[in-house]
């Protein structure tokens, strides 16, 4: 049995969970999320907790046990607290701003890069160099943050580019020159 999967998921007070077979819907103050879980697990609600159990002891079912428990736990936490991912723009001329809902990033190209947020994700910019991606769906927030970072990933010589807050970049020494 999965060590992660056997832990029950507590349901906070302001969160409502609806189970319909393998379809799980979670509604809370930060929004509403729904997901259909893969075959091999069963989901049940016991008092104020959600319990995920494997339907058999086959390898696939045991593999999916911990995964499904984590997916449901992330949904519950997302609609109650939400998720945020922060990025930093480093380098001369690197700026970001929000126009309407769009994020406009100037990262040293000849043109600014515009990004539309998907449903349920919002962008916020502090002092033109710090971008915050927030939303209820952990997967969507992480994907959008990765797309922003991919515009100009940090380079190893001077560290310029877009990086996650607190991310360490392995630095390389430049050319040593001829002696």
Swiss-Prot record:
Q: Which InterPro entries match?
A: Ribosomal_uL6-like, Ribosomal_uL6-like_a/b-dom_sf, Ribosomal_uL6_a/b-dom, Ribosomal_uL6_bac-type, Ribosomal_uL6_CS
- Gene3D superfamilies reported for this sequence: Ribosomal protein L6, alpha-beta domain
A GO cellular component annotation in the UniProt record: cytosolic large ribosomal subunit
UniProt keywords, alphabetically: Ribonucleoprotein, Ribosomal protein, RNA-binding, rRNA-binding
**GO annotations under biological process?**
cytoplasmic translation
Single GO MF descriptor: rRNA binding
Please, which domain of life does this record's source organism belong to?
Bacteria
Keyword RNA-binding, does the record have it?
Answer: yes
According to the record, the segments passing through the membrane are none
A Pfam match: Ribosomal_L6
Cysteine pairs bridged by disulfides in the record: none
Q: Which family does it belong to?
A: Belongs to the universal ribosomal protein uL6 family.
Question: Could you tell me what this protein does?
Answer: This protein binds to the 23S rRNA, and is important in its secondary structure. It is located near the subunit interface in the base of the L7/L12 stalk, and near the tRNA binding site of the peptidyltransferase center.
Instruction: Read off the PANTHER family from this record.
Output: 60S/50S RIBOSOMAL PROTEIN L6/L9 (PTHR11655), LARGE RIBOSOMAL SUBUNIT PROTEIN UL6M (PTHR11655:SF14)
Q: How does it assemble?
A: Part of the 50S ribosomal subunit.
Name of the protein described by the UniProt record = Large ribosomal subunit protein uL6
Protein species of origin: Prochlorococcus marinus (strain MIT 9313)
Q: Which gene encodes it?
A: rplF
